Amino acid sequence: MSTATFVEIILAIILPPLGVFLKFGCKVEFWICLILTLFGYLPGILYALYIITK
């Protein structure tokens, strides 16, 4: 695991859409993460961690 991935994981725990945005930009992954975070913080975190480590 690189340092960049580690930083993205930390950001995904603090603010899930930010971690996904840094990795993928403003693509569909970001919007899915944003919607999941708005529906509930935990689903947003789980999705962000999954998509970053995939």
Swiss-Prot record:
Keywords in alphabetical order: Membrane, Transmembrane, Transmembrane helix
Highest taxon above the source species: Eukaryota
Localization: Membrane
Induction (free text): By low temperature. Also promoted by abscisic acid (ABA) and dehydration but is not a general response to stress conditions.
Major site of localization recorded for this protein: membrane
Membrane topology: Multi-pass membrane protein
Pfam families in the record: Pmp3 (PF01679)
Transmembrane segments: 2-22, 32-52
GO cellular component, one term: membrane
One annotated GO biological process: response to cold
InterPro entries xrefs: PMP3
Family recorded in the similarity comment: Belongs to the UPF0057 (PMP3) family.
Protein name stated in the entry: Hydrophobic protein RCI2B
